[in-house]
Each structure stands twice: as C-alpha cells, then as structure tokens.
C-alpha cells in the first residue's frame, strides 16, 4: 500500500496537467487514523464527483463494543456518524476553488427515518465512510494545490470530529442508541400483544408541509382513546402508553381535514425507525406493513388475481393474468396478491386512492348489475378471509360507504386530530342497517407464476467496442423510479419508498438479478429470496462485484423489492 506522502507527490506531479491525469491518484493511502481510498476519479470537473472512502479501525475509532452488538444498533450508529460527518463537511465544501464541481464535499443526506446506507457501514473490523469530492480544476486544467487542501487539511479535521468516539457527543449518541433499542422493544411487543401498530401518547403526527417531513409546529399531540390504550415497558424510557391497534380489520373514519390520512401516513412510515425530535419516534407499525392503492396503467405480469377478478368477457385467465395497461381495480388486486407473496402481514388502504369498484359494491348496484355479470369480487368481501385464513390485517381509511362498518373489528373516529374509539357505538347501529349476505366464492391462496426472463444484452453497433455487449446502465429519477437499459421502472405509487437512495439501490438489485440470476426458470420470488440472503449476509456491498460500492445507496425493504421487480416489464 502506498503512503500519504506518495499521494502528495502524485498531486504535485499532476498539478496543472490536463484533467484526465487525476486518474493516477486512484488507490489507497494510510493517514494517521484512517486509510483513504480514491475509488473512482471523475472524467472532468463538470461530471459527477469522484468517489472516496475512508476506513477507520474499531480500535482507533474507540466506540463501545455494545454499539456493534446487533444490526439495528449498528445501523443507528452508522446513521449517527453519517449525520455527524455531514455537519463537519458543510464547513468545508466549496472552500477549495475551481470550475464545475471543484471543491464539492458531500455525503448522503439523512432524513427523519433511520436507514441502512452505503454512506457509512460498520464491519467486524472497521467503520467505512463513503462520500464524494469534486476534484478541483481551473477550466479543465488540474488544480492539485486545492485538492491537497481538501485531502490533507480539511478531511482529517472532519474525520477526527465525526468518527472518533472521544470527539463525539457521548450523551447524544447514547440517546440515539437507547431510542433504537426502545423502538426494537416496541416492535417485539406488537407481536406478543396481538397488535399491528402502536402510536404513543404525545406523538406529533402532522408534517410541516407536503415537501417537508419535519414535524408541524403547534400541532395537536396524539392522545389515545382509553379503550385502546396499552402500556409498554421499555428498557430505557420505562413505561410508555399509547394507542394499540389490534390485529384484524381496523377502520379509520371522520370528517374531512380531521386527521384520518395523517394517522394513516404516520402508520405507513412506522415501518421505519425515526430520529429523536421527529414526533413519530414511538409510532411503530409491523415492519411488513404495505400501503396499497390503485395504479391506472400499471404493468402486470403472470399474477394470480382470481381471488378478486374472474370470468372476464374475453375469457382471459385471471389465475395467470398479464396486461400492459391495468385498470385501477386490476392494479389494486395485483398489488394485494403481490403483497401476500412479499410476506406482508398488514395492508394499509385509503379509500381516496383506491378504485371504488374494487373496494365495495352497494346493494343498489348489485340489483342493477347481477353478480354473474360482475367479474370483480370487492375487497369488502375478502377482507375477513384475508385476516382469518391468511392472517393479514387491514387498516382502512374510509368515509363514503357504510359497508366496511359491518366487518370492522375496530373503528377509530378522528375528531379534530383526536382519536375516538366508536366500535361499540357503530356495532349497535349496524343492527339497524343490516348488510346483504356476502356471496363471494371460496377463498384460495394465490399461486406465484411469474418467471423472470433472461435478457440478451444489446450489442454495440458502432465505435471501438462495436460487436461487444452493451453494459446495462441505470439512471435514477429520484423516488419516482429509474431507467434501466431502455426501460422505465415506474415507482411513483410505491408510497413507502422514502429516499432516492432506496430507488438507486433497487436499480442495482434489478440489474444484478437480470445479469446474474434470471434464467427463464426462476420465479421472481426465487430470485428475491437469493437477493434477500445476500443482503442479510453482506448488505448492499455484494452488488459491487468485487470492486467498490459508492455512497448514494440505501437499503429498501423486501416489500419494495417485490414492488420494483413486479413493475419490470420482462
């Protein structure tokens, strides 16, 4: 391995040369407390910045061993360190001058949720931080003097302050670790307490705005109805009380603007841990919960939707259904079946974003259009079977139909952001307004059919590499999806994707599956099972192919991996 003095000598040797000469810097160099690696050098000062990583041995970093004891605590520490490093580099970014992205220093920006990111990874031996630096230039002429400032003056200070335990705020870090342990404890108690979600008293659910996930100031704190209040004992916070949502079918109702969707939004993001001060730190949902909605125009391939749709006029087989342009009802049926395959134990639905004809058929409509002429079995007629036979609970926001009141186990009315348990009151009313007997066909578990097709690589038609296979490239469109090769994967309605870095990771996972796992025999479920094992064992690093993985990727849940792969048109 070269020494840091070798890096200085290289910098002096490339100073004022043409920008591509920076490529000579690629390699690893030991500094006092860490090893600096220049993994990828940008092509010019206006291109995406260079990829840098540093490795700090645990002995040097000095963090307590108990902070590495399990995956959740390790992820919390990684998240904390990435946030601390970002706080340090903000003082130095663009302090080195030049053209284009010269002087940029950046790392993943962590939001309100705690995610496992490639920006900071903890292994058995070391802490690895990955970030970006814009190598300075004047025009397209190397300015190595400015890069030397970044690597030898700015960076060592940032590393010392962010990644050495002796320089961190011990109390703040311990509070983050303790919060994560308390959140894990609540998740465990959901299962043992026959609950699907918990919302602590005092939680702040409304957000600052539609483009901000920070808590709204002066909003109404959440207070549980007495009949749904549960008390949990946590290892650090001690006793905490709040609303426990039982397994089964839960209905959330209330007038417009009273907080129904706000509660549902908090529950759908309760699959993630939140940082202290977010207001939703103790809003915890079963981590397999899946938000579902209709998605007009969605691609569907070989999905068994016969649980909900049968006897189509064109005689199309709904046990292995495909379409390039799904209707709202068909897309929602497919989403539920795909969610079952992904192992979801809770479905979250909002009437506002659901297909009306998929959710319910009222008595009058049943009289006008007889059952034998209607191919759709509405969700209303399957929700109880989903719980009793498949052990999948439902939380539904509703406001326009009486029908769901008759099958709900728990009914919560939101009244000026205050939840009220009206279950008993509604049961008394249901006797006055009886529902027609359900005539749905027998419940049968859907069967997975979809085989992932092996894709022949495109062949370059011109240039010096003509005749060689083209590399499958990915272009990420924020949280909305990505372009892989020439195909768009649309993820706009996968609502529990919260960070563009998760979308980027999904692109890498799909690319790996296409190139390494698709063989015209494995199903999507088979492929995701292989990927899941790799992710659990090696994290996202296994996607590097023996090279390196950069900053800019965050771990998606298994449910979002399924959602992504099922939207890929192969």
Identify the meaning behind each predicted range.
Residues 414-503:
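Conserved P-loop NTPase
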Residues 1-185, 189-194, 205:
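N-terminal accessory targeting/assembly segments
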Residues 206-241, 276, 284-289, 293-300, ...:
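N-terminal pre-Walker A segment at the start of P-loop NTPase domains
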Residues 240-272:
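Glycine-rich phosphate-binding P-loop
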Residues 340-383, 387, 400-406, 410-428:
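Conserved P-loop NTPase nucleotide-binding/switch module
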Residues 320-354:
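Phosphate-binding/switch loop-helix module in NTP-utilizing enzymes
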Residues 490-570:
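Terminal-proximal interaction/regulatory segments of ATP-powered molecular machines
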Residues 298, 311-329, 361-376:
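Flexible beta-alpha connector loops of hexameric P-loop NTPases
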């Amino acid at each position: 391995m070269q020494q840091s003095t070798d890096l200085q000598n290289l910098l002096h040797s490339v100073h004022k040369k043409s920008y591509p000469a920076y490529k000579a810097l690629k390699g690893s160099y030991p500094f006092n407390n860490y090893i600096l690696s220049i993994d990828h050098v940008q092509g010019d000062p206006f291109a995406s910045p260079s990829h840098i990583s540093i490795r700090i041995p645990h002995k040097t970093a000095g963090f307590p061993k108990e902070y590495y004891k399990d995956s959740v605590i390790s992820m919390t520490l990684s998240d904390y360190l990435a946030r601390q490093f970002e706080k340090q580099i903000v003082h130095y970014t663009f302090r080195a001058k030049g053209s284009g992205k010269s002087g940029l220093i950046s790392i993943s920006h962590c939001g309100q949720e705690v995610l496992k990111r490639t920006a900071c990874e903890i292994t058995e031996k070391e802490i690895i931080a990955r970030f970006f630096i814009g190598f300075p230039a004047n025009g397209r002429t190397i300015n190595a003097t400015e890069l030397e400032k970044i690597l030898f003056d700015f960076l060592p200070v940032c590393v010392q302050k962010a990644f050495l335990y002796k320089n961190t705020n011990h109390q703040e870090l311990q509070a983050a670790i303790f919060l994560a342990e308390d959140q894990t404890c609540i998740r465990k108690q959901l299962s043992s307490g026959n609950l699907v979600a918990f919302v602590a008293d005092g939680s702040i659910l409304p957000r600052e705005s539609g483009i901000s996930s920070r808590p709204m100031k002066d909003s109404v704190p959440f207070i549980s109805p007495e009949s749904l209040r549960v008390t949990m004992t946590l290892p650090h916070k001690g006793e905490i009380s709040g609303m426990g949502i039982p397994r089964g079918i839960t209905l959330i109702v209330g007038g417009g603007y009273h907080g129904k969707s706000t509660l549902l939004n908090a529950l759908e993001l309760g699959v993630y841990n939140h940082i202290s001060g977010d207001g939703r730190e103790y809003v915890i949902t079963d981590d397999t919960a899946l938000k579902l909605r209709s998605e007009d125009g969605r691609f569907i391939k070989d999905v068994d939707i016969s649980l909900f749709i049968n006897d189509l006029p064109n005689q199309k087989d709904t046990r292995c259904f495909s379409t390039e342009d799904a209707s709202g009802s068909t897309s929602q049926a497919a989403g539920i079946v795909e969610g079952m395959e992904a192992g979801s134990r809770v479905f979250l639905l909002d009437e506002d974003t659901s297909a009306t004809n998929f959710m319910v058929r009222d008595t009058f409509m049943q009289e006008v259009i007889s059952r034998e002429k209607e191919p759709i079995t509405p969700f209303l007629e399957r929700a109880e079977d989903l719980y009793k036979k498949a052990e999948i609970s439902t939380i539904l926001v509703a406001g326009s139909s009486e029908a769901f009141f008759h099958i709900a186990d728990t009914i919560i009315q939101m009244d000026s952001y205050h939840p009220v348990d009206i279950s008993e009151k509604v049961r008394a009313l249901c006797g006055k307004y009886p529902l027609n007997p359900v005539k749905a066909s027998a419940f049968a578990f859907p069967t997975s059919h979809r085989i992932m097709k092996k894709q022949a690589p495109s062949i370059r038609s011109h240039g010096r590499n003509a005749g060689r296979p083209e590399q499958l490239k990915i272009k990420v469109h924020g949280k909305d999806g990505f372009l892989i090769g020439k195909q768009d994967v649309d993820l706009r309605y996968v609502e529990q994707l919260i960070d563009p870095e998760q979308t980027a990771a999904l692109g890498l996972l799909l690319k790996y599956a296409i190139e390494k796992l698709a063989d015209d025999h494995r199903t999507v479920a088979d492929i995701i099972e292989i990927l899941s094992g790799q992710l659990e064992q090696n994290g996202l690093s296994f996607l590097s192919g023996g090279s390196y993985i950069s900053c800019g990727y965050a771990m998606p849940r298994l449910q979002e991996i399924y959602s992504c792969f099922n939207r890929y048109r192969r």
